[in-house]
């Protein structure tokens, strides 16, 4: 199977290319924090030679509680993204939740993301596809990897073949997620070689069954990320925060920003090693 290349500006995303880091913060908490987080990612990825795309949400539309922080909204969020692009020269990935958001967001962001909970909403999928933007599809927690081929087909039927697939874990009973490492290969197969990336921090979520916010297992982020990259994938999707214990969303799953360089350094070493191996055909 030939691996497809999806281009994000000058970044070539493919399963057999050096991994791309899609990293940032969960939600835009403030303009100043976004600048701080982006600056650190740029510093680390430039130093280590890792291709980089900044990620954050302008609206967390699927929060569990009506009282939870959602973000600054689309208009203010796009202004922050524009400033980040102008200041640091980064590419941007962010998610959309409504059809009306697709066009204006695609005019600023380099990649628009289809949220896991909305990945089967055909009208939204078609609206995103028709922008012509690169689309990152989050695999729903309730969907098997093989079913991702149907979502890819919807996008391609609209004339857009710039698709990236992302695993963020699968439901394992109530309020828990696990990652099936065989699923990455299945998604590659059903998409005919599309780039597949791994959202390691969201995969560490562990809900309180009676609470209004997600817990997490950030103490295991390194081992889970290593496992994902060992399969041979196109990229890693990561959230970091200067103060995870006081983050406004998903702090328990976020990597402390202070250890970002050590983390990315390990991931690059592992990715380089895995992709130095010759491909073996074990299907015969």
Curated annotation (Swiss-Prot):
Keywords: Cytoplasm, Lipopolysaccharide biosynthesis, Transferase. Its EC number is 2.5.1.55. It catalyses: D-arabinose 5-phosphate + phosphoenolpyruvate + H2O = 3-deoxy-alpha-D-manno-2-octulosonate-8-phosphate + phosphate. Its main location: cytoplasm. It is found in: Cytoplasm. GO terms for cellular component: cytoplasm. GO terms for molecular function: 3-deoxy-8-phosphooctulonate synthase activity. One of its GO terms (biological process) is keto-3-deoxy-D-manno-octulosonic acid biosynthetic process. It holds the Pfam family DAHP_synth_1. Pathway: Carbohydrate biosynthesis; 3-deoxy-D-manno-octulosonate biosynthesis; 3-deoxy-D-manno-octulosonate from D-ribulose 5-phosphate: step 2/3; Bacterial outer membrane biogenesis; lipopolysaccharide biosynthesis. PANTHER family: PHOSPHO-2-DEHYDRO-3-DEOXYHEPTONATE ALDOLASE (PTHR21057). Belongs to the KdsA family. This is 2-dehydro-3-deoxyphosphooctonate aldolase. It comes from Mannheimia succiniciproducens (strain KCTC 0769BP / MBEL55E).
């Amino acid at each position: 199977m030939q691996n497809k290349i999806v281009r994000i500006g000058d970044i070539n995303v493919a399963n057999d290319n050096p991994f791309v880091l899609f990293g940032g913060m969960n939600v835009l908490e403030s303009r100043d924090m976004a600048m701080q987080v982006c600056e650190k990612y740029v510093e680390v990825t430039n130093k280590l030679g890792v291709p980089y795309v900044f990620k954050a949400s302008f609206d967390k539309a699927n929060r569990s509680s009506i009282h939870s922080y959602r973000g600054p909204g689309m208009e203010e969020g796009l202004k922050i993204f524009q400033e980040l692009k102008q200041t640091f020269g980064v590419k941007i990935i962010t998610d959309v939740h409504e059809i009306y958001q697709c066009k204006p967001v695609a005019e600023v962001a380099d990649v628009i993301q289809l949220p896991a909970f909305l990945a089967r909403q055909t009208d939204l999928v078609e609206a995103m596809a028709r922008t012509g933007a690169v689309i990152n599809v989050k695999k729903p927690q309730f969907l098997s990897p093989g079913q991702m081929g149907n979502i890819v087909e919807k996008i391609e039927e609209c004339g857009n073949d710039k698709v990236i697939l992302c695993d963020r874990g699968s439901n394992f009973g109530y309020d828990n997620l696990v990652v099936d490492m065989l699923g990455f290969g299945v998604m590659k197969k059903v998409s005919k070689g599309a780039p597949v990336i791994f959202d390691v921090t969201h995969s560490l979520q562990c809900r309180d069954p009676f609470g209004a916010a997600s817990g997490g297992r950030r103490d295991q982020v390194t081992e889970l990320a290593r496992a994902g990259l060992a399969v041979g994938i196109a990229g890693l999707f990561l959230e970091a925060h200067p103060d995870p214990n006081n983050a406004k969303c998903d702090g328990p799953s976020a990597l402390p920003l202070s250890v970002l360089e050590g983390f990315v350094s390990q991931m690059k070493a592992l990715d380089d090693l895995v992709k130095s191996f010759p491909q073996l055909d074990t299907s015969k």
